[in-house]
Regions:
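NTP-dependent small-molecule kinase module
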Residues: 2, 126-166
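Walker A (P-loop) ATP-phosphate-binding motif of ABC ATPase nucleotide-binding domains
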Residues: 5
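Hydrophobic anchor at the beta1->P-loop junction of P-loop NTPases
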Residues: 8
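The conserved Walker
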Residues: 12
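Conserved glycine(s) of the Walker
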Residues: 15
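Conserved substrate/cofactor phosphate-moiety recognition/catalytic segment
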Residues: 18-64
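Glycine-rich phosphate-binding loop used to anchor ATP phosphates in small-molecule kinases
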Residues: 49-94, 127
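A glycine- and Lys/Arg-enriched "phosphate-lid" helix/loop adjacent to the NTP-binding pocket
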Residues: 90-134
């Protein structure tokens, strides 16, 4: 698998950031989290203007080597043509929600967290560019190297294999 420019998609809480960070370190390439492009603040409450976000994503994807990860299909569709590899983390919604709860253990059940949990819990039924059906279309349309990982064990094994060959 040619990981020169790797794009990782999947639900919130699926492990995209975990895998992206480790791949980027292993491959010595920059890592871009599309949350940092889509949102103006760390609270994920104010979205960046669409054209500005797309411009930032295109800029990151114009580099020679990278790992980019995110849930936003409307952004991914604009940069997918630059990727040499696509990794889809298609993890069960219940596992994604549990992972978010672990990750946000210090957070109180505020409105933002509850909204994120509800959104992650609807990945397989959502009919928007960030839902499972949209990610499946992106995955099926991608003609270069790609893999679909269905659970955390597969994600860990995939990274272990990359680490052992690098």
């Amino acid at each position: 698998m040619d990981l020169t420019r790797t794009l990782i998609i999947g639900n919130s809480g699926s492990g995209k950031s975990w895998l992206a960070q480790r791949l980027a370190e292993q491959l010595c390439v920059p890592w871009t989290d599309l949350d940092r492009i889509h949102w103006l603040s760390d609270e994920h409450s104010i979205p960046r203007p669409r054209n500005e976000a797309l411009g930032m994503a295109r800029g990151a994807a114009s580099e020679e080597r990278w790992v980019i990860e995110g849930v936003y299909g409307w952004i991914v569709s604009e940069i997918l043509h630059r990727a040499t590899a696509l990794i889809w983390l298609c993890i069960d919604d219940v596992d994604c929600v549990a992972n978010i709860r672990r990750r946000e253990a210090e957070a109180k059940d505020d409105e933002r967290l509850l909204a994120m949990l509800e959104w992650a819990g609807s990945y397989h039924t959502r009919d928007d560019s960030s839902g499972c059906a949209a990610h499946q279309r992106l995955f099926e349309g991608f003609t270069d190297s790609k893999t679909q990982l269905m659970d955390r064990a597969e994600i860990t094994d995939f990274f272990g294999a990359i680490r052992n060959t690098g």
